[in-house]
């Protein structure tokens, strides 16, 4: 980020694609709970378990040749600090280089607890699929002024709590740009415009093989502004 260099991130769930992705210079591989939708065929990420995530993580680790591997912490796997620490430990022992958790300021304690123990954390904000039942679907987040201010303040709080990275999903490009310029940590975007430090896509969407009515999500550039 200090050198204004962009970086790339793709999801992977098994060894062969992980090998191809890594050998072609993708900086970060996310073993995401999106596997619940694109691999298992569910209509959300909620059914994915820790054991399933770890299985796919181990497959990706076996195919990786140098990319940073980030692993999602599935739904309710960090509902308490003790549970979150135990599950993050399992992911790191299985080969992850960092873990990703979803939420706003309420995950600050979890982010700090993990960071204090040497576990790099990516905080996922904006459209957070694990809260899809509360937010009512795949809708752009941060369009109205109060919501925009809330997201900015929570991003700052998460950085202060020790988050090493931030992922912004499906927010307006101007909001993502402001957060990226405000924070010192790298910001990854998906459907959040072109001004974030990095971009991420679900590999099935990139390859055009997703069978979902709503790909995870549209994200070639700035879906939130369209």
What are these regions, as identified by a protein language model?
Residues 1-5, 217:
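Generic N-terminal amphipathic, Lys/Arg-enriched alpha-helix
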Residues 7-9, 13-42, 46, 50-68, ...:
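Alpha/beta enzyme core
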Residues 71:
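Glycine-rich nucleotide/cofactor/substrate-binding loop typically near the N-terminus or early
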Residues 212-218:
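Short, intrinsically disordered, charge-balanced linker/junction segments flanking boundaries
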Residues 219-226:
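Conserved small/polar residues in nucleotide/adenosyl-binding loops
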